[in-house]
Amino acid sequence: MSRLEQRFAELKAEGRSALVTFVTAGDPGYDASLEILKGLPAAGADVIELGMPFTDPMADGVAIQLATLRALEAGQTLAKTLQMVREFRVGNQTTPIVLMGYYNPIHRFGVEQFVAEAKEAGVDGLIIVDLPPEHDAELATPAQAAGIDFIRLTTPTTDDARLPRVLERSSGFVYYVSVAGVTGAGSATTEHVTEAIARLRRHTDLPISVGFGIRTPEQAAAIARLADGVVVGSALVDKIAQAKDAGQAVKDVLSLCSALADGVRAARV
């Protein structure tokens, strides 16, 4: 059983949803980013998505684009992101880490080398937003062969004809993007999310995590009553942007994570 399978199974037994937190690797700098990463589990994060900075983050809203820019300006590379996971794993062998980003940096790094190093570092899953199922052979197949889950995004515009193809080789969990568009924009109604999850469950037994637009403990609690996982990214990244220094960024991100975790746990079904 993979770390992701284990974590979702444990939470299902507890009768609650997972808090899935997103931060960009290297934002606002390597050391502060690593401190945030190491602090997230104790602050209540059940699964961590770690963004791989890329110069053209087309699916991301302004907050995460700016986070990517800060990370790249601070010298973050894919090699450093993998090193960050290695350092995290020294003290934490249980919290799943999912790398999220775009295919280009992985292609440049070399797929075979990336998969080998990601596995060795302790990466549990990948979300590659610009790699559709038609290109499974390029990364999804070798990643899954190495024991790394490949997590698919589905959206309100993914129709019933397309869903089976998208979900066919998915593993770990399904990431439902509750608002079509870029990250951090708007939020979906609970009625819409309820319908969407019911539709997804007709096609998959995988846990379903819902993200995009969730910013407050109250919103997190509302989604936690419906989904297997609640994904929060832009709200955490905004705390880094607003902080006066790296120390404040660490403190504020972990404080918000703790509040979100309280919301998710209060919604135990």
UniProtKB/Swiss-Prot annotation:
Q: Which UniProt keywords apply?
A: Amino-acid biosynthesis, Aromatic amino acid biosynthesis, Lyase, Tryptophan biosynthesis
Enzyme Commission number(s):
4.2.1.20
| Reactions mediated catalytically | (1S,2R)-1-C-(indol-3-yl)glycerol 3-phosphate + L-serine = D-glyceraldehyde 3-phosphate + L-tryptophan + H2O
Task: Tell me a GO cellular component.
Answer: cytosol
**SUPFAM superfamilies, sorted:** Ribulose-phoshate binding barrel
Q: List the disulfide bonds.
A: none
What Gene Ontology molecular function terms does this protein carry? tryptophan synthase activity
Domain of life of the native organism: Bacteria
InterPro entries with a match to the protein in the record: Aldolase_TIM, RibuloseP-bd_barrel, Trp_synthase_alpha_AS, Trp_synthase_suA
Identify one Pfam family in the record. Trp_syntA
Q: What range does the record give for the signal peptide?
A: none
Pathway given in the UniProt record: Amino-acid biosynthesis; L-tryptophan biosynthesis; L-tryptophan from chorismate: step 5/5
**What positions does UniProt annotate as the active site of this protein?**
49, 60
Function, in words: The alpha subunit is responsible for the aldol cleavage of indoleglycerol phosphate to indole and glyceraldehyde 3-phosphate.
Q: Which HAMAP family match?
A: Trp_synth_alpha
Q: How does it assemble?
A: Tetramer of two alpha and two beta chains.
Q: Which family does it belong to?
A: Belongs to the TrpA family.
Protein name from the UniProt record: Tryptophan synthase alpha chain
Instruction: Identify the species of origin.
Output: Pseudomonas entomophila (strain L48)
Question: Which taxonomic lineage is given here?
Answer: Bacteria, Pseudomonadati, Pseudomonadota, Gammaproteobacteria, Pseudomonadales
